[in-house]
Structure formats: structure tokens, C-alpha cells
């Protein structure tokens, strides 16, 4: 759609040719489509909602994706086979989509797999998807920005983020949240249509004069 602007940053020109564990924050069902667009050699670990979805379910099952309820330990050998075929494995470590855009606690599964399969981790930050298609209104498309940032690979044996998968879960989570906060500072401005509409909406029921003033003021300053 013309009212959705797309921005993509690839910090180190990642090609995904070397298999890795891809982790990303999760805001909207379009996150899945965005991650899969980065390479044809990406498969995902999905939750029960996606696995049983009338829209995505049959497609992802046919594509050989993995279901988190199977348990990581039971899937490891099948995943190892896909890795040998050149596939990266994408996971949303938060487990489910966020309602408010804030990143939630990370589960340990992705980091367990990185350690077990000896795969690097590629962190990806997604911004704006939850504003364009929110979890609460999955069929309503708003104006906004679809922004993605591929951060540098974290080597599986890089101990600067910890030496165990438990430590790496906490430290990489903190690292991604800090980077995401920087993106929000940059993008949460009236130049972003989604942020502009949210700002105006905050005043819309207070007074038509205040709403008019805010709209004019914001447009003059940006």
C-alpha cells in the first residue's frame, strides 16, 4: 500500500548464506512474512496459533516448519538436517506477539538451539509492524512505517554475551532491547504517520479546537 513506507537496514550486509539462528521481536503476523523475505533458506519455529491458523497453518506445515509444542529436544535432529541443507532457523524468542509494542521477556529456546547446533545468532529488530497491523485488529491496516534492522551476527562461541545459553538469553535480550529503544527514539516522531495519528488521537475527544491546533502545530514543525 502507498501509505506504508518500508525501510531496511542491514548493518553488515548479511546474506544468510551461512546457516544461523535468527531471532526477532514480535509485533504482528506480518513479522513472519518479513523474516521469510530475507532469504529462501529460512524455516521457522512457530507457536500453536500460527500452526493452527486457517490462513498460514497448512502452508507452514507443508513448508516443513517446526512447532514449538513439539519441544526443542525432540526437534533437534530434524533441525540439524535442515541446517546441513543450508537453512537458517527463525524464532521469536518472546513467544507471542506484543500488544503494546514493548519487547517482552525472552524464552531460552533459541539460545539453547544455538548452543546445541553450534549456530551463530542473527538478531533482527522489527519496528512499526504492530502499528500497521495490530494484534488486537489483525484485519485493519493503518498508515505507518515497516522498519527492519539486521544487527551483526553473534558467533556461537562469542563469550562476550555469556558462556551458557541461559546467560546469553539475558544478555542478548538486553542488547536487543537497548537497540530497539534507540530505533523508537528515532522513529517515534510526527514524521511517522502511525505516531502522528496516535498523537492526534490523544487529543481528539478533548476539544475540536485542541485537535485542530495539534494537527496544525505538528505539521508546521515537521
Please report, for each region that a protein language model flagged, where it lies by residue.
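Short acidic-hydrophobic, aromatic-tinged amphipathic segments that line or gate anion-handling sites
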Residues: 8-9, 66-70, 156
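Glycine-rich helix-loop-beta junction characteristic of Rossmann-like nucleotide cofactor-binding loops
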Residues: 10-15
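Secondary-structure boundary/capping positions in well-ordered alpha/beta enzyme cores
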Residues: 7, 41-42, 66, 86, ...
Amino acid at each position: 500500500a502507498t501509505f506504508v513506507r518500508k525501510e531496511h537496514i542491514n548493518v553488515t550486509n548479511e546474506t544468510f548464506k551461512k546457516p544461523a539462528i535468527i531471532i526477532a521481536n514480535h509485533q504482528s503476523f506480518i513479522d513472519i512474512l518479513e523474516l521469510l523475505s530475507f532469504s529462501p533458506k529460512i524455516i521457522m519455529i512457530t507457536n500453536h496459533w500460527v500452526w493452527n491458523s486457517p490462513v498460514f497453518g497448512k502452508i507452514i506445515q507443508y513448508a516443513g516448519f517446526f512447532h514449538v509444542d513439539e519441544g526443542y529436544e525432540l526437534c533437534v535432529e530434524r533441525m540439524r538436517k535442515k541446517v546441513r541443507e543450508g537453512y537458517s532457523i527463525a524464532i521469536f524468542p518472546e513467544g507471542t506477539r506484543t500488544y503494546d509494542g514493548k519487547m517482552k521477556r525472552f524464552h531460552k529456546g533459541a539460545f539453547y538451539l544455538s548452543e546445541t547446533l553450534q549456530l551463530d545468532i542473527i538478531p533482527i529488530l522489527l519496528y512499526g509492524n504492530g502499528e500497521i497491523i495490530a494484534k488486537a485488529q489483525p484485519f485493519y491496516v493503518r498508515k505507518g512505517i515497516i522498519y527492519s534492522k539486521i544487527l551483526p551476527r553473534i558467533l556461537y562461541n562469542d563469550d562476550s554475551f555469556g558462556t551458557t545459553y541461559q546467560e546469553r538469553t539475558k544478555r542478548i535480550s538486553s542488547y536487543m532491547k537497548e537497540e530497539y529503544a534507540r530505533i523508537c527514539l528515532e522513529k517515534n516522531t510526527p514524521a511517522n504517520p502511525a505516531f502522528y495519528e496516535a498523537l492526534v488521537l490523544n487529543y481528539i475527544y478533548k476539544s475540536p479546537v485542541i485537535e485542530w491546533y495539534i494537527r496544525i502545530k505538528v505539521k508546521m514543525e515537521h
